[in-house]
């Protein structure tokens, strides 16, 4: 490998895509050389330069050329350790030398926004892929399919984009000096941060400053996008998640500024919340989720808000949909939230408080659709008991082989994010089933084999149940569709578990009782 040709190709790519001005080419080249510990460079023949330009023009995103540069650094002993973590830190460092400063990117963003809001986000999204902040190569590894259900098509993904931690990195973390900078992975101080073995490098992160309802916020994309233009909007202040009147103001203020995007929030309580409760933030993007496509199954009316169109959504979880004037939506959403926070229905296992701890909250999802503001509110409760120690309205234990983690807002909206282990585990199950079918042996032999396999034993009862419920005899050609259906049915059941008002006569009547309680408050 000629490292100089690789660097020149990367810089040429950056110039072609307006990441680097021609006048800054030498400056940026030297910065990249410094980042990989290289103190020399060379000139290129006309033929080489032509080949470099042609190669750069053929690149959509610079993942491969960056990987080759990082590979060179690893072979030259330039990394603390040759692990994915340290390779990623160098990868971000190199692109951080190439990207313009935030002020330049933000000025370009808002300049385009004045002419075309959609183009502004399109350009910024593209920049995040060109900078390798969005890891397009890793995201492409994810497995995804649609699953038909009685609520509409659900979206299923097996997440393979996040690399496994190397044991050497895990061991090195114990030697890291504790630091409170940045306070978390969402703080604004991450922008340009060099990272460390236990904190991702963010030299190639750029965030756009925003004003939401008079407060300072920032807009960025997720490095591991789960759907189209998956963005994160986070508070300038490191403060805990909080679902309240201001939260509804913020999400609707955002969709007023970016009507082609939705914005949603994880819950602000453990178990029903997301993985980061310590920093106030939202997730949005340009994707029509299954929940958005779901119809309203029962129209309702709220006292004093007769101008707001409202209804119960035909969805496995308990969701209200509100449509109308932005400010009126904010006030009604807050009224519903306050009613829900104090609401109990012991016959359905819903307790607002136990031992002075409150359990009720909501997931809001804001949109601007067909000329109107729209706000979905998914009702959540995080109570536990001895039967369900991980959560009463949480995936039940018999589903934990597929999904045991918290159900966050992305999954509430109908997109399953399932662990990468399922790829190999399901492949092993399909192999056992195929062998049994070919040999004409009963599937009981497969269940017995699985029960003796540490990785597969958790799936044995689950598989037996889904085979017994499958409408047609299993064939070797139908194993893929069978497994996809079994996983999809399981995810649908997971969402139903999380619903506070079940799809039973008692549950539906309980939902109506809650709506009456809102109207009587």
Predicted regions and their residues:
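Coil-to-beta-strand transition motifs
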Residues: 228, 260-262, 275-277, 290, ...
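Catalytic or ion-translocation cores adjacent to nucleophile or general acid/base/metal-coordination motifs
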Residues: 246, 255-275, 284-344
């Amino acid at each position: 490998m000629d490292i100089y040709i690789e660097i020149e190709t990367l810089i040429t790519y950056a110039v072609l895509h307006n990441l680097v001005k021609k006048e800054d080419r030498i400056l940026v080249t030297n910065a990249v050389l410094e980042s990989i510990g290289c103190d020399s460079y060379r000139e290129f023949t006309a033929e080489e330069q032509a080949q470099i330009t042609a190669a750069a023009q053929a690149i959509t995103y610079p993942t491969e050329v960056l990987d080759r540069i990082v590979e060179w650094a690893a072979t030259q002993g330039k990394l603390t350790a040759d692990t994915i973590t340290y390779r990623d830190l160098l990868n971000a460092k190199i692109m951080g030398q190439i990207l313009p400063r935030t002020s330049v990117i933000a000025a370009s963003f808002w300049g385009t926004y004045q002419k075309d809001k959609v183009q502004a986000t399109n350009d910024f999204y593209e920049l995040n892929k060109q900078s390798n902040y969005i890891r397009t190569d890793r995201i492409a590894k994810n497995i995804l399919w649609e699953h038909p259900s009685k609520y509409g098509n659900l979206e299923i993904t097996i997440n393979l984009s996040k690399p496994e931690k190397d044991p050497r990195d895990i061991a090195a973390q114990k030697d890291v000096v504790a630091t409170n900078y940045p306070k978390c992975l969402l703080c604004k101080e991450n922008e340009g941060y060099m990272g460390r073995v236990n904190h991702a490098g963010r030299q190639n992160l750029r965030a756009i400053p925003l004003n939401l309802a008079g407060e300072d916020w920032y807009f960025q994309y997720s490095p591991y996008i789960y759907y189209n233009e998956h963005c994160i909007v986070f508070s300038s202040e490191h403060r805990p998640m909080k679902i309240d009147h201001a939260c509804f103001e913020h999400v609707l203020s955002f969709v007023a500024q970016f009507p082609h995007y939705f914005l949603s929030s994880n819950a602000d309580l453990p178990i029903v919340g997301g993985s980061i409760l310590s920093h106030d933030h939202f997730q949005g993007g340009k994707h029509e989720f299954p929940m958005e496509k779901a119809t309203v199954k029962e129209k309702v009316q709220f006292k004093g808000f007769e101008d707001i169109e409202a209804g119960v959504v035909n969805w496995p979880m308990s969701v209200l949909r509100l449509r109308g004037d932005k400010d009126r939506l904010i006030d009604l959403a807050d009224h519903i939230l306050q009613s829900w926070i104090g609401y109990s229905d012991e016959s359905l296992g819903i307790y607002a408080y136990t031992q002075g701890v409150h359990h009720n909250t909501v997931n809001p999802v804001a949109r601007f659709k067909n000329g109107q503001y729209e706000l979905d509110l998914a009702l959540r409760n995080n109570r536990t008991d001895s039967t369900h120690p991980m959560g009463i309205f949480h995936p039940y234990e018999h589903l934990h082989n597929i999904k045991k983690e918290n159900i966050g807002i992305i999954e509430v909206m109908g997109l399953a994010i399932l662990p990468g282990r399922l790829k190999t585990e399901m492949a092993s199950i399909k192999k056992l089933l195929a062998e049994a079918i070919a040999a004409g042996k009963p599937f009981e032999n497969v269940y017995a084999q699985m029960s003796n396999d540490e990785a597969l034993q958790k799936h044995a009862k689950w598989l037996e149940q889904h085979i017994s419920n499958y409408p047609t005899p299993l064939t070797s050609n139908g194993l893929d569709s069978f497994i996809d259906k079994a996983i999809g049915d399981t995810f649908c059941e997971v969402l139903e578990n999380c619903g506070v008002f079940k799809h039973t006569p008692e549950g539906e009547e309980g939902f109506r009782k809650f709506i009456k309680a809102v109207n009587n408050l």
